Amino acid sequence: MENTEHFGALTPRMKAFREEVLDEKPYVDAERAILATQAYQENQNQPRVMARALMLKKILENMSIYIEDKTLLAGNQATKNRNAPIFPEYTMGFVLKELDLFEKRNGDVFYITEQTKQQLRDIAPFWENNNLRARGEALLPDEVSVFMETGVFGMEGKLNAGDAHLAVNYPRILKEGLCGYEARTQACLAALDLTDPDSIDKTVFYRAVLVVIEAVRTFALRYSALARELAEKEADDARRAELLELSRICAKVPYEPAESFREAVQSVWFIQLILQIESNGHSLSYGRFDQYMYPYYQADMQSGRLTREDALELLTCLWIKTLTINKLRSQAHTLSSAGSPMYQNVTIGGQTTDKKDAVNELSFVVLQSVAQTRLTQPNLTVRYHKNLDPKFFDECIEVMRLGFGMPALNNDEIIIPSFINWGVSEEDAYNYSAIGCVETAVPGKWGYRCTGMSYINFPRLLLCVMNNGVDLTSGKRFVKGYGSFADMESFDELMAAWDRSLREMTRYSVIVENFIDKASERDVPDILCSALTDDCIARGRTIKEGGAVYDFISGLQVGIANMADSLSAIKKLVYDEKKITREQLWNAILDDFQSPENQEIQRMLIEDAPKYGNDDDRVDQLGVDAYAPYIDEIRKYPNTRHLRGPIGGIRYAGTSSISANVGQGMGTAATPDGRHAFEPLAEGCSPAHNADKHGPTAVFKSVAKLPTDKITGGVLLNQKMTPQMLASAENRQKLEALIRTFFNTLHGYHVQYNIVSRETLIDAQLHPEDHKDLIVRVAGYSAFFNVLSRQTQDDIIARTEQ
């Protein structure tokens, strides 16, 4: 659905540009890897911080650049749009193992030429045992080796990738320009007492910052020269004028402050792009775009330098350019990040720091531009609050109707107080933005990696608890073991064993994350990212060393609903009503419900026990009780930046499992809720597939019983409706009322919608050529349906239509 009558259509050239980008096959790109290798080889005598700065300098000064015929913005990540650069300093392991498999994947396919394969093989020897993954794995203690061997903790994203889940200080960048950062760095460097041992690392850091600022300026000047060269050859007068203006802008920003809307957009794009050339961490987000860009928009509109149509076309160009950024993941990593997502989040709406509605004219323009482009990037989030502009809320619902899973809605009424309770200043709490999927942070002030990556698998752990601490799938011991299910005379015994085991597993997850974070801090400091995050320059530390103002990490879990439903079935059918014996249930699980008698047990588990998502306290409270040990335990453990400067340095809970419910399900045996072995688990805090039978209000009530004020890392809720359900204005108003109740009264944290019919999805599986730009909401992000694996497609189809 396009609804051009409501939102208007892309300009002809932006429509053509969009199609060109969508038609690009994603290829593996070796250029960055070659340049990075050369830089590392040339600077082996340098401290790692300086070596990383010189690496970025080498890349930005030598990488291929181009300006597309239809673009209004300059800047590219790779030799072609949608190509995925390689980051060998993180790992070459999966790249070499999968060189001949990238094109054969059943999802997240990448293409690769024989020349590229050889180029990557040529540089590989230098990186053997000389990258983050190698050093991280060597650093890990034996105590957690079993979890890495079995893939229980999903650390692929941390060992293979860089800085992620943050937004730099775009308002300050636009106001001061990088020249302002340069001046502050020079002043800090000049003020150091070099007899103080603490000044040694600071000296190196400040010099590295100056290197990358100059490198960014050089990069922009290369585009300025290219735009001028293209202008000289351009026959069309209007396009020649555009190229000359682009040349002028690139000669100015981001080094100098932006003074117009066009300059501000180009400056932001350069930084957003270069951060993802420096490092391949995903979820590099734009922050509160409508707030920091509005002064430039307003001034240009008032002066007559800009029309609304000009701004709209420029933003659609920005979003198309945003889609060109790509990332190659290992096959294992794609199981938790299906659809090649980059999670580049744009946040609009919300409140000002003086607690007024923050919606402005640019908020509407951003909505319209995203509606016109209908792409998977950027990830659009709207901050909801009880006084949100009603017309703006109406427009949000209209965008949802388009069926590409945006915008997601975050609730100020729960998130802001939660941040304040954790020690975030009130002013900063009111300025939060979405980072990546559902995670939130204060843009420009938040530390490295605001989300955990270990994905504690609740249903798999429950089976482990029932098996005296031994994992059913691998046969390995995960936790100490507190008895077998057959010997547990009461439900309280099972819950006591669950409590102790979950705390133990939580501790193991922290060990893994801290050791890998320390390896990342030592091996791959990212200098530009640090420089653009407050207060790294003031402290003389990288973001991974504790340079940010705040630093909190949220833990992640998978299968919350399966856990609750499993406990519900065990309590009711085994212990309370004694319709199934402990031995019968355990044997049925081991049999995967295959025999006729075990199929009957499966039927009872599915049909005769309360299910999460139906506003039934019997099961909802079990979910809350079983989750409580994790919430309590995770906050006990500091992260590697604790007491090194930032406010916080600790952990809290979060439920964003992205698409790990599919990958983690592949390693999980049959569960007591009646789920078959190796099928997907429930995602986020959403009910299990087809378990919610009483409509969306009941789902909202079940989800809201979770202690959302303590799950500050995000409470991700996916919902699905058919397009027909929102066809009438009356039904759209009903949805608005439902969301208001969820947020205002029930204190829900987040909700997002897939507005697509089951029939459309099934037809897209059968006839993918007819649905090349069909977009679905996977978890806290949207993806093109056709690039997803069959397992993930089936998982999305199976989600209940409300």
Language-model-derived ranges and their functions:
Residues 230-240:
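A conserved hydrophobic secondary-structure block that centers on an alpha-helix together
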Residues 2-206, 242-245, 249, 253-802:
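Conserved catalytic cores of very large enzyme subunits
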Residues 228-229, 297:
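Extended, structured, electrostatic nucleic-acid-contact surfaces
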Residues 207-218:
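Extended non-globular scaffold/tether segments
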